[in-house]
Amino acid sequence: MQIFVKTLTGKTITLEVEPSDTIENVKAKIQDKEGIPPDQQRLIFAGKQLEDGRTLSDYNIQKESTLHLVLRLRGGMQIFVKTLTGKTITLEVEPSDTIENVKAKIQDKEGIPPDQQRLIFAGKQLEDGRTLSDYNIQKESTLHLVLRLRGGMQIFVKTLTGKTITLEVEPSDTIENVKAKIQDKEGIPPDQQRFIFAGKQLEDGRTLSDYNIQKESTLHLVLRLRGGMQIFVKTLTGKTITLEVEPSDTIENVKAKIQDKEGIPPDQQRLIFAGKQLEDGRTLSDYNIQKESTLHLVLRLRGGC
């Protein structure tokens, strides 16, 4: 169908659209015709500003309807919302928008109900009734979105300085996920984090429930041990596994770490470095394996000896 888009200069643009087109699609068509970037466009119909993720039919826009195109409102700005999966969502907001408004925009774009959203900025959880300007959130600021899923719980992470960090987690979260949450809150790279609970160092590929970590449990966060280093293990499929090790770790220890991450029993693993097969009882330093060295993992097929 055809619709019309009228600009403030009085110009009328004719567009070919489908009722199922999103507002985002329409803005892209306007960009193609007129060269106006979508992030500078606001479309108004029946007195309402149209949200990118909605469709024309959602707004009952029919053939030969006229939309009004205005420039971004004064004070309008873009902010970014980053999810734990690494996806970044771009939102058009005003400094006077409440956190509740922002959650509604996220719901429009991503379908996540506001009551499952927690927004974090500068390490603080944002309260619904406050505005972006209350928190000094400015253009191109990045908020972090964490989901309050059913079964969610709080745990505490205590640092060596005595600071306690509160995290929203699921029993099914891996230690790797928890390290990503700490990075979001505190800026500490995951490869510098080691978690201790009940006297044990926690392995990245395991879950909180594997370690019987329950609501309001306290983990201890320590920096990588002196001498700690990363090495890489490359499989025949081309996958590369990153491991945290010590030079004093035995090949047996390394195989146990690979089992934790990948589920491959140690007796099916053969590790090769510099053309040599590594023996279980030897250490990494025996073989002069240093930080960021790459080992090759080959599987010992059934029937092999």
From Swiss-Prot:
GO terms for biological process: modification-dependent protein catabolic process; protein ubiquitination. Pfam families: ubiquitin. Gene3D superfamilies: Phosphatidylinositol 3-kinase Catalytic Subunit, Chain A, domain 1. Keywords: ADP-ribosylation, Cytoplasm, Isopeptide bond, Membrane, Mitochondrion, Mitochondrion outer membrane, Nucleus, Phosphoprotein, Repeat, Ubl conjugation. GO terms for cellular component: cytoplasm; mitochondrial outer membrane; nucleus. The record marks 68 as: Essential for function. The modification ADP-ribosylglycine is found at residue 76. There is a cross-link at residue 76 (Glycyl lysine isopeptide (Gly-Lys) (interchain with K-? in acceptor proteins)). InterPro entries: Ubiquitin-like_dom, Ubiquitin-like_domsf, Ubiquitin_CS, Ubiquitin_dom, Ubiquitin_ubiquitin-like. The record marks 54, 72 as: Interacts with activating enzyme. There is a cross-link at residues 6, 11, 27, 29, 33, 48, 63 (Glycyl lysine isopeptide (Lys-Gly) (interchain with G-Cter in ubiquitin)). The modification Phosphoserine is found at residues 65, 141. One of its GO terms (molecular function) is ubiquitin protein ligase binding. Residues 1-76, 77-152, 153-228, 229-304 form the Ubiquitin-like domain. Residues 305 form a propeptide. SMART domains: UBQ (SM00213). Ubiquitin is encoded by 4 different genes. Uba52 and Rps27a genes code for a single copy of ubiquitin fused to the ribosomal proteins eL40 and eS31, respectively. UBB and UBC genes code for a polyubiquitin precursor with exact head to tail repeats, the number of repeats differ between species and strains. Interacts with SKP1-KMD2A and SKP1-KMD2B complexes. PANTHER family: UBIQUITIN. Belongs to the ubiquitin family. This is Polyubiquitin-B.
